[in-house]
Amino acid sequence: MSKSLQLIVTVLCIFTILVLGEICLAKGQPLEEMVECKEVLWPEECKYDACAFACALKRHGKGGCLEGPDYRSACICQYACKRS
């Protein structure tokens, strides 16, 4: 067996063992109950694209503009969080 082929087989075996180990570890851990949380990212005038980007960046969620009672829009971020 050539050295390069031997190296490739070794790397693939190590990678497979690591992946299988991670899968076994993940199966053994209980899932935490997640709920939907909302957060006002900024209360001033909302631009939808900026709001969606900020929410995805900050909380890995989905952002949108919501009009408040005083007819101003705010950036509302919805994301999954742990139940407290």
From Swiss-Prot:
GO terms for biological process: defense response to fungus; killing of cells of another organism. Keywords: Antimicrobial, Disulfide bond, Fungicide, Plant defense, Secreted, Signal. Its main location: secreted. Residues 1-28 form the signal peptide. It is found in: Secreted. Disulfide bonds join C37-C81, C46-C65, C51-C75, C55-C77. The keyword Ion transport does not apply. InterPro entries: DEFL (IPR010851). Pfam families: SLR1-BP (PF07333). One of its GO terms (cellular component) is extracellular region. The keyword Isomerase does not apply. Belongs to the DEFL family. This is Defensin-like protein 140. The gene is LCR15.
